[in-house]
């Protein structure tokens, strides 16, 4: 059975030759070179992923939603009752939440995964529960390093198993009351930003309670002293089971050479951890939308990512990842279905990148 160290070691590098061939093919399509903008660069990125065999393609699609509760909820950093995590996880199994509707529209299957819900097991939810909620990061670590490593490996294996069964495009999502607080702590640590710069309203936290949330994040970092150069240390000390789970999806998909669509702010924090743990993961990450959460800009700048959609969304759940799946499919359709200039009577001046 593969260890976490072996999984990280075996993440493949991008196929530079395949990317060059893809760029050459795209430049020869029936359009001015570069005129489809980022759709072209996305197709080239996909072509470099070894799991897609040198060509942009999408077969089965899956959104993996990591569900967990957080001890830091006790600090008054969220307005929703903790039980909402379990209620919404159950609603996901019925297909009635935002991510389920958007995923169905995109033709993707939603996998609802319990990595730490503080409730009785829920029928229809995949059980990878580490504990009933993680520790309160304002007073100590979220979990042990061993727990974080074990969950990373378990989720990575689950992701790779889905890849073996035909999934070629993954989306990540989360569900957990108070989870924007550990996400803000992680972004603060990885980017070196003060908590005031990254803490937002989450699920409609009143402005009068923001200062408390900022203070909680600062205390969590001061008490736990996470090492920003050690992604697993940050996850285990100021993260949460859902954030570890999303990081595991990214590591597992990268190990299989396959793309992962990020969601919003929570997924950005997990992406920062994944890229710190294994920098090669970066090639496989596709930013879906620009989260409306306050710290989004800082996190995305640190990741050097520019999301494809600006929708003022902050639902989470993987909703943005599901919404962006058709964009990935459009890049593949462009690559495979457009005609070629060489077969037409059109001759474009060299360097012309403007649409006619």
UniProtKB/Swiss-Prot annotation:
The active site is at 317 (proton acceptor). It is an enzyme of class 2 (transferase). Pathway: Nucleoside biosynthesis; alpha-ribazole biosynthesis; alpha-ribazole from 5,6-dimethylbenzimidazole: step 1/2. One of its GO terms (molecular function) is nicotinate-nucleotide-dimethylbenzimidazole phosphoribosyltransferase activity. Pfam families: DBI_PRT. SUPFAM superfamilies: Nicotinate mononucleotide:5,6-dimethylbenzimidazole phosphoribosyltransferase (CobT). Keywords: Cobalamin biosynthesis, Glycosyltransferase, Transferase. It catalyses: 5,6-dimethylbenzimidazole + nicotinate beta-D-ribonucleotide = alpha-ribazole 5'-phosphate + nicotinate + H(+). Its EC number is 2.4.2.21. Belongs to the CobT family. PANTHER family: NICOTINATE-NUCLEOTIDE--DIMETHYLBENZIMIDAZOLE PHOSPHORIBOSYLTRANSFERASE. Homodimer. Catalyzes the synthesis of alpha-ribazole-5'-phosphate from nicotinate mononucleotide (NAMN) and 5,6-dimethylbenzimidazole (DMB). This is Nicotinate-nucleotide--dimethylbenzimidazole phosphoribosyltransferase. It comes from Salmonella gallinarum (strain 287/91 / NCTC 13346).
């Amino acid at each position: 059975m593969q260890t976490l160290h072996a999984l990280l070691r075996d993440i493949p590098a991008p196929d530079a030759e395949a990317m060059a061939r893809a760029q050459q093919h795209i430049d020869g399509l029936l359009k001015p070179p570069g005129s489809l903008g980022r759709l072209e660069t996305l197709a080239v990125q996909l072509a470099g992923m070894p799991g897609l065999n040198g060509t942009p393609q999408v077969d089965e699609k899956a959104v993996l939603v990591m569900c967990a509760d957080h001890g830091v909820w006790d600090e008054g950093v969220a307005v929703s009752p903790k039980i909402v995590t379990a209620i919404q996880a159950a609603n996901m199994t019925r297909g009635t939440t935002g991510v389920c509707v958007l995923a169905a529209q995109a033709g993707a299957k939603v996998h609802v995964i319990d990595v730490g819900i503080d409730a009785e097991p829920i029928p229809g939810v995949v059980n990878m529960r580490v504990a009933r909620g993680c520790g309160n990061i304002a007073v100590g670590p979220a979990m042990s390093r061993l727990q974080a490593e074990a969950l990373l490996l378990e989720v990575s294996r689950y992701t790779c198993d889905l890849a073996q069964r035909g999934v070629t495009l993954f989306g990540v999502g989360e569900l957990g009351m108070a989870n924007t607080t550990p996400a803000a702590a992680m972004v603060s640590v990885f980017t070196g930003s003060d908590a005031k710069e990254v803490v937002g309203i989450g699920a409609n936290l009143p402005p009068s309670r923001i200062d408390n949330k900022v203070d909680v994040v600062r205390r969590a970092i001061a008490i736990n002293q996470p090492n920003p150069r050690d992604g697993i240390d940050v996850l285990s000390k100021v993260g949460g089971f859902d954030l570890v789970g999303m990081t595991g999806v990214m590591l597992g998909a990268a190990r299989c050479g396959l793309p992962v669509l990020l969601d919003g702010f929570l997924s950005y924090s997990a992406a920062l951890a994944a890229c710190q743990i294994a920098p090669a993961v970066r090639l496989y990450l596709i930013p879906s939308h620009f989260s409306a959460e306050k710290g989004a800009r800082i996190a995305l700048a640190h990741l050097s990512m520019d999301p494809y959609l600006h929708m003022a969304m902050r639902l989470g759940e993987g909703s943005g990842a599901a919404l962006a799946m058709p964009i990935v499919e459009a890049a593949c359709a462009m690559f495979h279905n457009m005609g070629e200039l060489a077969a037409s009577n059109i001759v474009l001046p060299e360097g012309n990148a403007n649409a006619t």
